[in-house]
Amino acid sequence: MSIDQVTLARELNHLRELAQKKWEEDPLPTGRDAEVRLKKEIQELALESHITDFETDGYTVLPPGTAAPIELFDEIASVMEGLAKRLKTDNPAVSGLGETLYHMLPEHPAFERALMARAPLTLVTYLLGYRAKLSQCTGLIKDSNVPALGIHADHSAKFPAPWSPISNYSVVSWVLTDYTRENGAVCVWPGSHLRGQPVPENLVMAHDHPEMRVLEIPRGSVIIWHGSLWHGALPRTASGRRMTLVLPHVRDSVQPQELFWSSVTEEMISRNPPRFCTLMGLTSGPPWFQDGPDREQFVMSPYGGSKFE
């Protein structure tokens, strides 16, 4: 049974029309204007040290109180616990990821508020440009049965190596419970993003390598990293659960892993700033059906040559 492409095209075009109206409220910059606007936003939010972190280490951590009030973290954790009881989850205990919830964005407005939080989104813009799209809205729940997650780079299995210094994929992790060694914290290899290469096979489980750094950080923190950064996670040995909201993003030219333009609603568009539509992929040129590309859509696409578009 095939999908009714006529109905799908009509519904998608309707959402794109709404997105275009929102766009007119606050058009995204191109070319040199994108760099100027981003620099101003970074200064307004005092994020300069985090930009330095990206360049040297390939990741940065926003401390509690920077991305959002702690109440939002607690609300997200509560919502995820409820979703885990009624929705299908994925990944056996041996995977290293833990219990995984996919495509959570349409399930609760709390995820929208996390997505639109200004400081993390500004850092995503630095890595992927103003037209970055949300690729996943995923919840990870690790209990004491979950082993270590192998060290890897998110560009692996997505882009051929050697990778460009420019990131095409970036992860934003909302730390909903304390990260400690015993709790199965994320670990990273600082500066590995500069190699532009996948993790060698002999280092995939080298969590105790002297170059690896364990991120022992409190609940309420947010981690953002470059797609080429080598990272993994320790096994959880403590009782209880480690919970994380994971929001990977991609550049405008890259296809997201989850089809948000197919599940976004008019209400979601209405209650969010204009850039929400871009994150949903509604201001990108593709995809299209037999009616072909909408030329007005391409007006909203990057065309000035800046990596910050």
What are these regions (language model features)?
Residues A148-L215, V254-S263:
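Catalytic core of non-heme Fe(II) oxygenases with the double-stranded beta-helix
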Residues S2-A161:
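Non-heme Fe(II)-dependent double-stranded beta-helix
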Residues Q136-G139, V172-W174, L245-H249:
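A structural signal for short, well-ordered beta-strand segments
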Residues L134, V146-A148, S167-Y169, G240-R242:
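Short connector loops at helix/strand junctions that flank enzyme active sites
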Residues V61-L62, V172, I223-W225:
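Short hydrophobic-aromatic micro-motifs
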Residues Q20, R195-P200, V204-I224, S228-L229, ...:
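Conserved double-stranded beta-helix
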Residues T66-P69, G139-K142, Y179-R181, H193-L194, ...:
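Short, solvent-exposed loop/turn segments at secondary-structure junctions
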